[in-house]
């Protein structure tokens, strides 16, 4: 293996796994770029990103500019980051869920370019929330694409891909963790190939482009008029954030797990109606079919099975979930 000088740009837990593998593999990481510390938790105290926390543990210098645009709102911070990158004399930059747009001067600086770890099989699910949207859409597989970055939104040439199945019980949390590991493995292959000069970029096809728009908290409320299968996928897609929310018997709840139940044609139940509690699980009619609510959480409480919830908060058949 040829050791490269690798700048790393990333912020969340997804990116942390890649930084750890790059460093452990023996590549020299002279600089890490990550988002500025943000308020988090109940006390809203400033908290470092997972990538920053790891970089500090590894003794790697960290830069946290608000922007990298030299002509933007924070030109001094961008100029300082530019100086740090130039001084680092990097061969390549690896980018994973960084959260800032990379202007042309960044893309052109490393001799081997900027490699992006994207959590989908491009060109499907370009954009900010590819894991969530793949589950929500009912995709049976997704994966990782290693991409040579350009100035478009996830439009660069594909370098390497790896496929990951999506299981019927997968949530964004479970799929995220597997893809983070897969991305870390794939980026090491890409760095070895880049050092050897054997990477073969493939232009993304024009067909099959979809966009994974950023998840909005306003998507959380459950629309019971939708088919049960659609709602069930959204429940898994929105775990852990923002959660699928609804109201029942005066409680504000998050639904973390549900099972689709077929109903006969002409059943006569309204969407959102609790039609049974037999077997210890609330069964709610949807626009098509019904959902057995198998794991719920009251505001401020812990996650409970449907049975445990009913024991604590009995539900009358016929009431409507909001």
Swiss-Prot record:
Keywords: Protein biosynthesis, Transferase. Gene3D superfamilies: 3.40.50.12230. Its EC number is 2.1.2.9. InterPro entries: Fmt, Formyl_trans_C, Formyl_transf_N, Formyl_transf_N_sf, Formyl_transferase-like_C_sf, Met-tRNA-FMT_C, Met-tRNA-FMT_N. One of its GO terms (molecular function) is methionyl-tRNA formyltransferase activity. Transmembrane segments: none annotated. It is an enzyme of class 2 (transferase). Pfam families: Formyl_trans_C (PF02911), Formyl_trans_N (PF00551). It catalyses: L-methionyl-tRNA(fMet) + (6R)-10-formyltetrahydrofolate = N-formyl-L-methionyl-tRNA(fMet) + (6S)-5,6,7,8-tetrahydrofolate + H(+). SUPFAM superfamilies: FMT C-terminal domain-like, Formyltransferase. Disulfide bonds: none annotated. The keyword Protein biosynthesis applies. GO terms for cellular component: cytosol. CDD domains: FMT_core_Met-tRNA-FMT_N, Met_tRNA_FMT_C. (6S)-5,6,7,8-tetrahydrofolate binds at residues 120-123. PANTHER family: METHIONYL-TRNA FORMYLTRANSFERASE (PTHR11138), METHIONYL-TRNA FORMYLTRANSFERASE, MITOCHONDRIAL (PTHR11138:SF5). Attaches a formyl group to the free amino group of methionyl-tRNA(fMet). The formyl group appears to play a dual role in the initiator identity of N-formylmethionyl-tRNA by promoting its recognition by IF2 and preventing the misappropriation of this tRNA by the elongation apparatus. Belongs to the Fmt family. This is Methionyl-tRNA formyltransferase. It comes from Leptothrix cholodnii (strain ATCC 51168 / LMG 8142 / SP-6) (Leptothrix discophora (strain SP-6)).
């Amino acid at each position: 293996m040829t050791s490269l000088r690798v700048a790393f740009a990333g912020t969340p837990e997804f990116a942390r796994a890649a930084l750890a593998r790059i460093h452990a593999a023996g590549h020299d990481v002279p600089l890490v770029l990550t988002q500025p510390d943000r308020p988090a938790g109940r006390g809203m105290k400033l908290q470092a990103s997972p990538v920053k926390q790891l970089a500090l543990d590894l003794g790697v210098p960290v830069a946290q500019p608000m922007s990298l645009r030299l002509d933007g709102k924070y030109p001094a911070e961008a100029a300082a980051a530019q100086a740090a990158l130039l001084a680092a004399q990097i061969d390549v930059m690896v980018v994973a869920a960084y959260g800032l747009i990379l202007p042309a001067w960044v893309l052109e600086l490393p001799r081997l370019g900027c490699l992006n770890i994207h959590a989908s099989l491009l060109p499907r699910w370009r954009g900010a929330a590819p894991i969530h949207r793949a589950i929500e859409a009912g995709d049976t597989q997704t994966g990782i694409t290693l991409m040579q970055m350009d100035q478009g939104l996830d439009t660069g040439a594909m370098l390497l891909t790896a496929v990951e199945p999506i299981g019927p019980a997968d949530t964004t949390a479970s799929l995220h963790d597997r893809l983070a590991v897969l991305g870390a493995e794939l980026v090491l292959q890409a760095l070895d190939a880049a050092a050897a000069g054997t990477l073969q970029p493939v232009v993304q096809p024009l067909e099959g482009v979809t966009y994974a728009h950023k998840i909005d908290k306003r998507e959380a409320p459950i629309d019971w008029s939708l088919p049960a299968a659609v709602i069930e996928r959204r429940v898994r897609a929105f775990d852990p954030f923002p959660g699928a929310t609804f109201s029942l018997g005066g409680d504000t709840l998050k639904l973390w797990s549900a099972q689709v139940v077929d109903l006969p044609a002409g059943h006569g139940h309204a969407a959102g109606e609790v039609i049974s509690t037999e077997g210890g699980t609330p069964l709610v009619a949807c626009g098509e079919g019904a959902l057995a609510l198998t794991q719920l959480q009251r505001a401020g409480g812990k996650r409970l099975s449907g049975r445990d919830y009913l024991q604590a908060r009995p539900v009358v058949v016929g009431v409507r979930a909001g």
